[in-house]
Amino acid sequence: MADNLEPLEPSLQNLVEQDSLKWIFVGGKGGVGKTTCSSSLAVQLSKVRESVLIISTDPAHNISDAFDQKFTKVPTKVNGFDNLFAMEIDPNAGLNELPEEYFDGENEALRQGRHARDDQRPCPGIDEAMSYAEVMKLVKGMNFSVVVFDTAPTGHTLRLIAFPQVVEKGLGKLLRLKMKVAPLLSQFVSMLGMADVNADTLSQKLDDMLRVITQVNEQFKNPDQTTFVCVCIAEFFSLYETERLVQELTKCGIDVHNIIVNQLLFLQKSHDSCSMCASRFKIQEKYLDQIADLYEDFHVTKLPLLEKEVRGPESIRSFSENLMKPFDPKAEPKE
């Protein structure tokens, strides 16, 4: 990069101001504070968007703990907010675990797809892939201005991100071969116990499935509509996972230009007698320098390690201000 490159704003202001964004994924290594960051981002978005949904795709489902409010698979208004909603789902469970009200009106096709997929459970990999596809299609059809995804740790998230390309490619090849393999498809249908479905019907189902996957894949790769925020801490393994995640996202064609470095120590004079604080500070400084070198064309937001946990809507509301402007350790803490 050029030596005179101006550093980018060290905040998430760019995301909050990008009105075209529809999906914002927040992810990283386990234990780095993804849920706190995604919840804080959702709070800031609720100030400028008509309606915001934060959705957990992490089986651990920590957003209920973060907001100190029980959430389910139905979008529920967050206490203290008029336009912020939250829900928790497990993509691996598929649409069978989602409530019937999701499948009214325009989503009737998804209802049919869910029941048709019940007969395909013996096919390894198909179930998980289509669960992801259907959940994402479902979210795409919801009437929220923007959706924030609180994702599972890196490995699980990479599968979520990569699935549209993999399935789209596989289904495309299968459909191109459908004329050659029609007899085999008929045998395949019989093996699945779908005697009333012929090869043409199955081909149509695959065609419909491909259409859904293609729509999701197009939105995934559209930087005007979708972006990814990586959360890490200033330690070796977290930085390693972040670089792996950034490379995979880039390979998949998914926009990523924001990194949050969480749980940072900002040394005060009162910490002079704390040798461990000083040691941790030096370690973090080393990795912050590496982050600055690796991601000079990223918005890098630095968040503090606090004395108290961030829990409850008011605590998150207060902490979320750190996403919009650099943290000032000299500022008076808000109660």
From Swiss-Prot:
InterPro entries assigned: Anion-transp_ATPase-like_dom, ATPase_ArsA/GET3, ATPase_ArsA/GET3_euk, P-loop_NTPase
Residue positions of the active site: D58
Molecular function via GO: ATP binding; ATP hydrolysis activity; metal ion binding
Binding residue positions for Zn(2+): C274, C277
Binding of ATP, residues: K29, G30, G31, V32, G33, K34, T35, T36, E235, N262
Protein's cellular compartments: Cytoplasm; Endoplasmic reticulum
Cellular component terms (Gene Ontology): GET complex
Residues of the signal peptide: none
GO biological process: tail-anchored membrane protein insertion into ER membrane
Keywords: ATP-binding, Cytoplasm, Endoplasmic reticulum, Hydrolase, Metal-binding, Nucleotide-binding, Transport, Zinc
EC number: 3.6.-.-
Matches recorded under HAMAP family: Asna1_Get3 (MF_03112)
Family designation: Belongs to the arsA ATPase family.
Assembly, per entry: Homodimer.
Function: ATPase required for the post-translational delivery of tail-anchored (TA) proteins to the endoplasmic reticulum. Recognizes and selectively binds the transmembrane domain of TA proteins in the cytosol. This complex then targets to the endoplasmic reticulum by membrane-bound receptors, where the tail-anchored protein is released for insertion. This process is regulated by ATP binding and hydrolysis. ATP binding drives the homodimer towards the closed dimer state, facilitating recognition of newly synthesized TA membrane proteins. ATP hydrolysis is required for insertion.
Name of the featured protein: ATPase ASNA1 homolog
Upper taxonomic lineage: Eukaryota, Metazoa, Ecdysozoa, Arthropoda, Hexapoda
